[in-house]
Amino acid sequence: MKFGEWHWDETGAPKDGAIVITVDIKAQVMSVFRGGWEIGTAVVLYGAGATPTPLGVFHITQKDADHHSNIYGGAPMPYMMRLTNDGVSIHGDLVADGWATHGCVGVPTPFAKKLFGIAKLGDRVIVTNGETLGVGQPIKAA
């Protein structure tokens, strides 16, 4: 996939079931699963340098469709889903080559809107740097 690309297809997926979101920093890809079925994927931006995106298992703790950063000069963060107490979030962004965030996971805004519509407080977000799990291996908390 290229920068700015995303796909969303719920065909055949269960109508309910746990939402699990995975982010692979190395591949620069987010995948969204519902009831074990992948329903969405997008190319992501991530934090680099002094503000890297943290790795680990997080839960969505806050949602705000029209959020603006209180740390970075009121920068728009549409469809924000907070992961950490210090502000790391998933949010809509212009996903372009050479861009980065201040630690957040940026996804194309139309994709963020779809994700925001199905994600609930407490849903799990797993952020890795190229790690994979075999069948039956547990997901370890950060």
Label every PLM stretch briefly.
Residues 1-52:
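Cell wall/extracellular polymer interaction/catalysis modules
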Residues 5, 9-16, 51-57, 62-142:
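Exported/periplasmic cell-wall-interacting domains
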